[in-house]
Amino acid sequence: MARVKRGVMVRKRHKKLLEQAKGYRGSRSRRVKVARETVMKALWYAYRDRRNRKRDFRRLWIVRINAAARMHGMSYSRFMNGLKRAGIDLDRKILADMAVRDPAAFSRVVEQARQAV
């Protein structure tokens, strides 16, 4: 049986890894061991933050809705309760966008929520 040497595969794997580490500072983009650790950490951060991004945006939407609702004399929790009772099915993303881009429409929604409470 022929002897298998791994030179070609190792070079291919290292090249792929260093390609992923492109743009990193210093030895993080040049040395294979350091680059591997850095890429692994970067991929873990990306995985974690894809999940955190959902939380962060929801938090941002709630802050924006709360601020806009308080400008109309209503707290966030009372506003959301009023929407639920009025049967208005708008999600937080749409409400936050409406509060920023179309304040007139948002004020009409607040009035409907106020009547339902």
Curated annotation (Swiss-Prot):
It comes from the Bacteria. Disulfide bonds: none annotated. PROSITE patterns: RIBOSOMAL_L20. Keywords: Ribonucleoprotein, Ribosomal protein, RNA-binding, rRNA-binding. The keyword Kinase does not apply. InterPro entries: Ribosomal_bL20 (IPR005813), RIBOSOMAL_L20_CS (IPR049946), Ribosomal_protein_bL20_C (IPR035566). It holds the Pfam family Ribosomal_L20. Signal peptide: none annotated. GO terms for biological process: ribosomal large subunit assembly; translation. SUPFAM superfamilies: Ribosomal protein L20. GO terms for molecular function: rRNA binding; structural constituent of ribosome. GO terms for cellular component: ribonucleoprotein complex; ribosome. Binds directly to 23S ribosomal RNA and is necessary for the in vitro assembly process of the 50S ribosomal subunit. It is not involved in the protein synthesizing functions of that subunit. Belongs to the bacterial ribosomal protein bL20 family. NCBIfam families: rplT_bact. This is Large ribosomal subunit protein bL20. It comes from Roseiflexus sp. (strain RS-1). The gene is rplT.
